[in-house]
From Swiss-Prot:
Keyword Phosphoprotein: yes
Stretch list, region Disordered: 1-28, 144-199
Biased composition (Basic and acidic residues): 1-11
Location (main, coarse): nucleus
Residues with the Phosphoserine modification: S172, S182
Lineage, uppermost ranks: Eukaryota, Metazoa, Chordata, Craniata, Vertebrata
GO cellular component terms, semicolon-separated: centriolar satellite; multimeric ribonuclease P complex; nucleolus; nucleoplasm; ribonuclease MRP complex
Biological role: Component of ribonuclease P, a ribonucleoprotein complex that generates mature tRNA molecules by cleaving their 5'-ends. Also a component of the MRP ribonuclease complex, which cleaves pre-rRNA sequences.
GO BP field: rRNA processing; tRNA 5'-leader removal
Compartment(s) of residence: Nucleus, Nucleolus
Highest taxon listed in the record's lineage: Eukaryota
Name of this protein: Ribonuclease P protein subunit p25
InterPro entries: Alba-like_dom_sf, Alba-like_NAB, DNA/RNA-bd_Alba-like
Length: 199
């Protein structure tokens, strides 16, 4: 593919796991109309996504939120969902994996001047159909069916799993380090050191 360059990339029609905008589309077809859909992209800033998601979920009318991303944005999608689960306790989660079909069109680069080549010759093009993995994570304040695949119950202990370590206090120059106490430091005997230097 070194002699080709990508001209365009488009979502293939029909048969793909659409993230569509209408009701009944996407991986969670039975969502309430007030659910928020966050489309996470590769260039999205997590702080911007989280600010909007947290503000949306703080409203009593919002009962569910869906984070969806595909390709290189899947890790960012998981990160957003995990941050929101830590900020808001008691969220039920359902995770769905799907694939999107993407058609890429590549065009050959014009070769250098060679003998026998016609200057107006059209460039060859190549079409590639790729299945790009995508992830959709539903977080809901309401209980969900625990028998459906990808279900995770709310975390019983919100927050970090272990308490943060207490910061070590600074010591004065004259104080011994922790664990040294008042023990004497071993010093060489005066006679032994003199013998080593004279030898």
């Amino acid at each position: 593919m070194e002699n080709f360059r990508k001209v365009r990339s488009e979502e293939a029609p029909a048969g793909c796991g659409a993230e569509g905008g209408g009701p009944g589309s996407g991986p969670f077809a039975d969502l309430a109309p007030g659910a928020v859909h966050m489309r996470v992209k590769e260039g999205s800033k997590i702080r911007n996504l989280m600010a909007f998601a947290t503000a949306s979920m703080a409203q009593p009318a919002t009962r569910a939120i869906v984070f969806s991303g595909c390709g290189r944005a899947t890790t960012k999608t998981v990160t957003c969902a995990e941050i929101l689960k830590r900020r808001l306790a008691g969220l039920h989660q359902v995770t769905r994996l799907r694939y999107r079909s993407v058609r890429e069109v590549w065009q050959s680069l014009p070769p250098g001047p060679t003998q026998g080549q016609t200057p107006g010759e059209p460039a060859a093009s190549l079409s590639v159909l790729k299945n790009v993995p995508g992830l959709a994570i539903l977080l809901s304040k309401d209980a969900l069916d625990p028998r459906q695949p990808g279900y995770q119950p709310p975390n019983p202990h919100p927050g970090p799993s272990s308490p943060p370590a207490a910061p070590a206090s600074k010591r004065s120059l004259g104080e011994p380090a922790a664990g040294e106490g008042s023990a004497k430091r071993s010093q060489p005997e005066p006679g032994v050191a003199d013998e080593d230097q004279t030898a």
